[in-house]
């Protein structure tokens, strides 16, 4: 009797988890499809609000990575290296937010103990978001990147070299990026940055 009860509980928990995974997957597929149909405008409207940092973000554009069997393994290795570099700068899951203003195109980012602000521009068809940082203690100027929303997840990514500049300015050591940049140096159109959720 106990074995039957235990098996039933395990099956119910597994079914519940699988249903949640399917629900999340369908939500991501739906938002991606609508975003493509609206030529990126869904992402523009969905950017507004506060996003909570969940971990490093990596985005490969183009076909060179997608066609490789090792693409997922490469992404995992890069994420692990980025986690180390971000931790050195005080950027950890739960210790960061990014807020995009609804009406004024302003943004505020809190990453670790650093708060950055400025304005942003978003080009819907290309998903290019350019952050214009306000002058302050860290003079970062304008940083172009890409923003992608899938379900309740935002991936905000930048060219590898620009991200190294930003995180270095926040206090991380460039040596922590050496493994990630070495892995990515042979690929074109590789963007790294941050993942957020609402």
Predicted regions and their residues:
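Bacterial Sec-dependent N-terminal signal peptides
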Residues: 1-25
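Lipid interaction determinants
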Residues: 20-103, 108, 116, 124, ...
């Amino acid at each position: 009797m106990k074995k039957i009860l235990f098996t039933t509980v395990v099956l119910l928990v597994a079914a519940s988890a699988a249903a949640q995974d399917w629900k999340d997957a369908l939500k991501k597929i739906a938002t991606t499809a609508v975003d493509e149909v609206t030529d990126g405008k869904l992402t523009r409207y969905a950017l507004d609000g506060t996003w909570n940092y969940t971990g490093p973000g990596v985005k490969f554009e183009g076909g060179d990575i997608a066609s490789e069997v090792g693409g997922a393994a490469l992404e995992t290795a890069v994420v692990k290296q980025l986690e180390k570099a971000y931790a050195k700068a005080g950027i950890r899951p739960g210790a960061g937010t990014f807020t995009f203003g609804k009406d004024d195109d302003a943004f505020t980012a809190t990453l670790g103990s650093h708060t950055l602000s400025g304005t942003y521009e978003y080009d819907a068809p290309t998903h290019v978001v350019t952050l214009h940082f306000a002058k302050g203690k860290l003079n970062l100027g304008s940083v172009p990147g890409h923003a992608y929303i899938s379900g309740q997840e935002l991936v905000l990514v930048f060219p590898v070299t620009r991200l190294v500049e930003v995180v270095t300015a926040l206090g991380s050591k460039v040596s922590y990026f050496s493994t990630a940049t070495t892995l990515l140096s042979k690929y074109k159109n590789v963007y790294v940055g941050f993942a957020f959720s609402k």
